[in-house]
Amino acid sequence: AHLAAAQALRPHLDAGRDVAMLNLGDVSIYATAAYLADILAADGYETRMMPGVTSFCAVAARLNTSLTGIDTPLHIVPGGCGALEECLAQPGAKVLMKSGRQLPGVLAALERRGLLERSALVSNCGLPGEQVYADLSVFPREQDAGYFATIIVKED
């Protein structure tokens, strides 16, 4: 899909047009825009990324909480990480991004580690249909959280 998108942009770039891609969150973290920029830059096109507000910072603000303190590490992990159990075992706060598709497995891993009560989920932060669960132990297991689901796991 990324190659096809880059191919669709090439005629516009070859014609001397500027092309922009809007992005939810920041383009430097798990963003399609970053993949496209890499493909186009490898073909010799000039690319530039503009910073945005990371989705997990927006989620923390929505929850009215800080992500971490000066003495606590912060781990940012894709929800589909194959080593999720190992990531959850690390000291510090965790951000599980784009967790919606893998939510049943993520919830099970959090439950096994006794972390549901210390975990919060926000889906579609700042968008229509926003869902906020400050305590994942009350999240309805049958509910679909959607693609833009972010989970914050805090330390004790």
Which residues make up each language-model segment?
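Class I S-adenosyl-L-methionine
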Residues: A1-E46, Y133, F139-R141, G146-T150, ...
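Structural motif corresponding to alpha-helix initiation and N-cap regions
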Residues: L3-A6, P78-C81, L103
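Short, structurally constrained coil/turn elements
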Residues: A15, I70, R113-L115
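A contiguous loop/helix-start segment that scaffolds small-molecule binding in enzyme catalytic cores
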Residues: V19, L88-D156
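Structural motif
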Residues: L22-L24, M50, M97
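Short beta-strand/turn micro-motifs composed of small residues
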Residues: N23, P78, S123
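Short, glycine/serine-rich, charged loops/turns that create anion-binding
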Residues: D26-S28, T54, R101, G126
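Class I SAM-dependent methyltransferase SAM-binding "motif I" and its flanking Rossmann-like core
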Residues: S28-Q90, E142
